[in-house]
């Protein structure tokens, strides 16, 4: 197991409508405890949301896999609402690796539940993709999350967000425990 310390800088562009944009720079793109870039990454996206709870967006990052994938594009949409003090978010995400034609692309149907600072997420992998379950808790700027990625392993992350002048910054620690199915544990 390797332990990682990340410095993430976020730049949010002001939005005068329901469309927003974001850009981030990170020392290593970590997703569910596993490195996706094996080094620095530049990331960004565009989001649309309206008052009904509907949202949609696109997000991208550079990645570095040994099979030739050099970029990731995620397309997503969903609907979020509150019911009896519980936040509910039902969404769909497509993960696309345009430079790779060996079947890395996959999709998930995601159900997120939240109450106060406590969150629970279920991601159901489609067409044979593994499922993922995560529980998270936040206390102010401090966040902790534990997830289990079927057939890959468990991950733990601890993060802290803060302001750097006019930017939102953060530090994160991530640890991954491999279940022995060939996951890249960084």
Predicted regions located by residue number:
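Outer-membrane beta-barrel proteins
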Residues: 4-5, 15-186
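Repetitive helical segments and hydrophobic/amphipathic motifs
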Residues: 11-12
């Amino acid at each position: 197991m390797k332990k990682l310390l990340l410095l993430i800088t976020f730049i949010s562009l002001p939005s005068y409508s329901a469309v927003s944009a974001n850009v981030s720079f990170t020392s290593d793109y970590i997703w569910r405890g596993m490195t996706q870039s094996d080094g620095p990454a530049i990331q960004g996206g565009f989001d649309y949301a309206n008052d009904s709870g509907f949202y949609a967006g696109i997000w991208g990052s550079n990645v570095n896999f040994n099979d030739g994938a050099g970029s990731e594009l995620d397309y997503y949409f969903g609907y979020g609402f509150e019911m009896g003090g519980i936040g509910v978010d039902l969404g769909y995400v497509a993960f696309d690796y345009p430079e790779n034609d060996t079947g890395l692309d996959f999709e998930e149907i995601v159900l997120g539940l939240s109450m106060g600072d406590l969150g629970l997420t279920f991601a159901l992998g489609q067409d044979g993709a593994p499922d993922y379950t995560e529980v998270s808790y936040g206390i102010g700027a401090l966040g902790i999350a534990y997830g289990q990625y079927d057939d890959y392993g468990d991950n733990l992350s601890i993060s802290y967000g803060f302001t750097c002048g006019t930017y939102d910054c953060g530090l994160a620690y991530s640890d991954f425990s491999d279940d022995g199915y060939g996951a890249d544990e960084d």
